[in-house]
Curated annotation (Swiss-Prot):
It is a multi-pass membrane protein. Belongs to the TMC family. This is Voltage-gated chloride channel TMC4. It holds the Pfam family TMC. Voltage-gated chloride channel involved in high-concentration salt taste sensation. Depolarization induced by high NaCl concentration may trigger the activation of TMC4-mediated chloride influx into taste bud cells, helping the return to resting potential. Also allows permeation of organic anions including gluconate, but their current amplitudes at positive potentials are less than that of chloride. Involved in pH and temperature-dependent modulation of salty taste. The chain crosses the membrane at residues 155-175, 236-256, 335-355, 381-401, 412-432, 470-490, 518-538, 540-560, 579-599, 640-660. One of its GO terms (biological process) is sensory perception of salty taste. It comes from Rattus norvegicus (Rat). Residues 176-235, 356-380, 433-469, 539, 600-639 are cytoplasmic. It is found in: Membrane. GO terms for cellular component: plasma membrane.
Length: 698
């Protein structure tokens, strides 16, 4: 026969004897003196009011009251402050009552089952994720910041893999399903917009072959790699254009999901109400770990997190102790350093603009035309300038941020902001220079652009030219990473290990610079977003590049780098990195949408030949649909649809804001209750010390 919760309580005489052996003030008087008693008299349903118990009350009656009270509560049995046997009896009693009364509805049952299934699927997905053990090992040895870099790299790798599948299904396959695409235009084909003759050489020398491979010219210029290869077919034009919006939407949704999940961790980590130290000490350990290696890795992760908290607390304490004169000195230093940062950025942008503007002029000189290596260098001149500035300025930004007196997490954010501005703005300046060449500086009445709407004399297929520039940026970024690793980092590590003296100290210890590495990923991904419309296979190339980069960085991390002397919060990485990715996605959308809606497509290449704009293909395709489908699609663009949609969206937004405000007030109330509970514990500890001292004296 099963025992009741009351009988289970009766098996623990220590709970009863402790009350009888207690001396001093009664429990009711102590509870009434608690700080929370002055503001929180009503404790909610199911909790006995304070002051109702007395020491002379019948013991069984009080235990029965507590048991009956707990049975009325809806909280799970594991949350009750009871012995284990009493909680088991209480859980069985609740189960019998639920079966007898049928209080658990079918909807609640399926909701519970769905939540359990979702949790199990999430755990299983995390278990089968590629390189999960590698990331865990990196986090344990080098900290959460370094782990976040590899996590972001894995995330971008799979996004590019998905985009590559969509590109192949919506561009390559439709091209070959409707027949073999035509060859390149011949020299006899001309139009009012000139002629376009891709240089598809046959047998060439090895230097020329290498030049074509690295520049995207020659046999690659008329290949599925670039926009100009795809023939002007209506079905292909629709799938080509729709793939751009489909891939962009997928990127946006996945990055937003990652940003929101990181925002929750950031808000919790940055909260000052809950002490980070107690959270790390009491709830950070995973009791399901098996094996010494897993235990040591978890210990290192907790150690790094505590180290970050202690470092930032020390910096904040020093900041609060500063005098007015010291604060003025600090702010003056920060102003001067920011002026220096602006000067460095201005010099970098001017160099990139100069390199892009004069590349065409230098390519036409006889010396460059006769020397293949010099021609390759001139062709890569904008990419070289961008890579040099991206290699030199981030360490300078790191040094400048260390002089500004911020916490390490704030320094990471500043370095990220400055570096992302450098990398993305340099790409913007490159695109602006190319736009200036394509559209004659925006002057459509100029002689070169008046006939066709673009500079057809210098750039007969401007989409392929843009794709080639993005292709060269992706390749050069990969080559720079390989060269820096093989020619700088490995020799530096060997020199540091073989020369323990002054020369070894001069070479220094290599530490993994997370901000610079992350911004390199975001810059590379932004280049791919810009160029994927003009170079459809660029996501596939970037997938292979990220795969090579993952293994290269993993090998160099464990063989060259040492754990960072200063770390930063994982919450900063989990939220800020996807946020910068969103900025890169927004920046990349501007040139792509501008090309689709405003610049006339090339007249001699690509699937949109002869159109006033690339977007003009959509209305023409709609007109070929049945009348019912046309009416429905045109209705989506009228005010009869957009105005109700705007009203419904506004109502949903207001509801979301109101719900967020309610949750905010609830969170504030819970925080106040936590503070009150802390005061209660302090008060009880003080009373216990006072009573112990009094009993010792007596």
């Amino acid at each position: 026969m099963e025992e009741s919760p009351r009988e289970a309580w009766a098996q623990f005489p220590a709970w009863s004897s402790s009350r009888k052996a207690r001396t001093g003030p009664s429990l009711a008087s102590v509870l009434n003196d608690l700080p929370s008693a002055a503001t929180l008299r009503y404790r909610g349903p199911g909790v006995l009011p304070w002051g109702t118990l007395d020491e002379n009350d019948d013991e069984g009656r009080s235990l029965q009251a507590f048991a009956e009270t707990a049975q009325m509560e809806s909280q799970p049995s594991r949350e009750l402050p009871w012995p284990m046997q009493a909680r088991r009896a209480h859980r069985k009693s609740q189960a019998r009552e639920q079966v007898a009364s049928g209080s658990e509805s079918r909807a609640a049952y399926w909701t519970q089952q769905l939540s359990r299934t979702k949790g199990k699927m999430k755990e299983g997905f995390q278990t089968i994720q590629p390189w999960a053990w590698t990331l865990k090992k990196i986090g344990g040895q080098f900290g959460a910041g370094t782990e976040s870099y590899f996590s972001l790299l894995r995330f971008l790798l799979f996004l590019n893999l998905g985009a590559s599948v969509i590109e192949v299904c919506m561009k390559l396959i439709p091209t070959w399903l409707e027949g073999a695409p035509p060859g390149p235009p011949g020299p006899n084909i001309s139009s009012p917009c000139g002629s376009y003759i891709p240089h598809t050489q046959g047998l060439v020398t090895f230097p020329t072959q290498l030049f074509n491979l690295l520049s995207g010219e020659g046999y690659l210029e008329w290949s599925p790699l670039f926009y100009g290869f795809y023939p002007p077919r209506s079905n292909l034009a629709i799938t080509y254009l729709c793939s751009v919006f489909a891939i962009g939407l997928i990127y946006l949704l996945f990055i937003l999901h990652r940003s929101v999940s990181g925002l929750k961790e950031t808000l919790l980590a940055e909260s000052d109400v809950l002490t980070s130290y107690s959270h790390r000490v009491f709830s950070a350990w995973n009791f399901g770990l098996c094996g010494d290696m897993h235990v040591r890795l978890r210990q290192r992760i907790i150690l790094y997190e505590l180290q970050v908290d202690l470092e930032e607390a020390a910096v904040r304490r020093r900041a609060t102790e500063q005098t007015l004169g010291q604060r003025v000195k600090v702010w003056s230093m920060r102003a001067l350093l920011n002026l220096l940062v602006l000067a460095l950025l201005g010099a970098a942008f001017y160099g990139i603009y100069w390199a892009t503007e004069y590349t065409v002029t230098l390519q036409e000189t006889p010396v460059v035309q006769q020397t293949p290596l010099l021609k390759l260098l001139v062709n890569y001149l904008p990419s070289i300038f961008i890579s040099v500035f991206n290699f030199v300025l981030p360490p300078a930004f790191t040094f400048i941020a260390s002089l500004e007196g911020y916490t390490h997490s704030r320094q990471i954010v500043l370095i990220l902001l400055r570096t992302v501005f450098l990398r993305l703005a340099s790409l913007v300046f490159l695109l602006f220079s190319l736009w200036n060449q394509i559209t004659c500086g925006g002057n459509m009445e100029a002689e070169e652009c008046k006939a066709c709407g673009y500079n057809y004399k210098e750039i007969p297929c401007w989409e392929t030219r843009l794709g080639q520039e993005m292709y060269k940026l992706v390749l050069f970024d990969l080559l720079m990473g390989l060269l820096v690793t093989l020619l700088i980092q490995f020799p530096r590590k060997i020199l540091c290990g073989l020369c323990p003296g002054a020369l070894g100290r001069l070479s220094g210890t290599l530490e993994f610079q997370v901000p610079d590495e992350v911004l390199g990923l975001i810059y590379a991904q932004t280049v791919v977003w810009v160029g994927s419309f003009f170079c459809p296979l660029l996501p596939l190339i970037n997938t292979a590049k990220f795969l090579i980069l993952f293994w290269l960085k993993k090998i160099t991390l464990f063989s060259i780098y040492s754990p960072a002397s200063r770390t930063f919060r994982a919450s900063t990485a989990n939220f800020f990195f996807p946020l910068v990715l969103l900025v890169g996605l927004a920046i990349s959308a501007v040139p792509v949408l501008y090309s689709i809606f405003l610049i006339p497509p090339s007249k001699l290449c690509g699937p949109f030949q002869g159109k006033l704009s690339i977007w003009a293909q959509i209305p023409e395709s709609i007109e070929s649909l049945p009348q019912t489908a046309q009416n429905f699609l045109y209705f989506l663009g009228t005010q009869a649809f957009t105005v109700p949609l705007l009203i419904v969206s506004s109502i949903l937004m207001m509801y979301t804001v109101a719900l967020a405000n309610c949750y905010g007030r609830l969170i504030s109330e819970l925080k106040r209750q936590i503070e009150t509970e802390v005061q209660n514990k302090v008060f009880l500890a003080q009373r216990a010390v006072a009573l112990s001292s009094r009993n010792g004296v007596s």
